[in-house]
Amino acid sequence: MTSQLRKINNVIEQFLLPLAEAVSGWSTLAAIRSALIVTLPLMFLGSLAELLISFPLDAYKEFMFRQFGPEWRMFGQILKDATFSVMSLIMVFSIGHHLADQFNHDNPVLRANPVIAGLVAFTAFFCLLQQDGDALNRRWLGVAGLFVAILVGVFATRLFLYFFSIKRLHLHLPGGTPDIAIPQAFNAFIPGMLTVLVFAALGAAMQTFVGMSLHEALYQSIRMPFDAIGEGLGRGMLYILSLHVLWFAGIHGANVLDPITHDIYGAAMLANEVAAAAGEPLPHIMTKTFMDTFVFMGG
């Protein structure tokens, strides 16, 4: 037994640890990881809000109703809407900011304003959202849009920094200015415009030629292997494997795969509830409740 454990440790030290170090040292993944970490205070606040409005105890709900009236959930819902419901927006800005910080560390002479980089990525993300009449589809502003937010945050910021590194695209002001933000803004003027124009063209092309937003297209592509496998152990194993591969790369797998969780396992849970209410056999084994109880034990 000891020799087997020693062999396993040798394999981990020789192959897995160098791979993990290489992955953790990749600048893009490091920026994504840091961007997630700095959002933890807001995510913790959103978690408290979710607990406040969804605590599964009737005595608690009755107490809150007596103390604060029928609108007692409003406070928690406002907090949730300001955190979880806009997580993709927070994330895309945070990624842009951290990638610009890395760029400035590697290019101390040619410095880009991290806030401007974050705002450019933020705007690029909006260019890809599908419009519902005069309103935007809010589904992709929250956790469901996190995967696209990560992609847009990386590619939009990388594109902006590429344009920014071309000094001919900088607008130089004559003389000195008392506020350093002014030359930084003018230097980023053309690179920022070009980046947003590229993503606006991509958003328009997706709507015109594909008939759906990039969010929908990527989600359908991610869902295809899950649908192809069919319901059962294979789909569950693929879901868990995908989730932990994302975690291995430093990305919050549960949040990225939230659309799969909601549309497949959440729908299966609702179908079981309908069948149970009708006195029929439950049609699904693997549901969101099954995953939370038997796979993700401990919450």
Language-model features, listed with the residues they occupy:
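Helix-loop-helix junctions within the multi-pass membrane cores of secondary transporters/permeases
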Residues: 261, 265-299
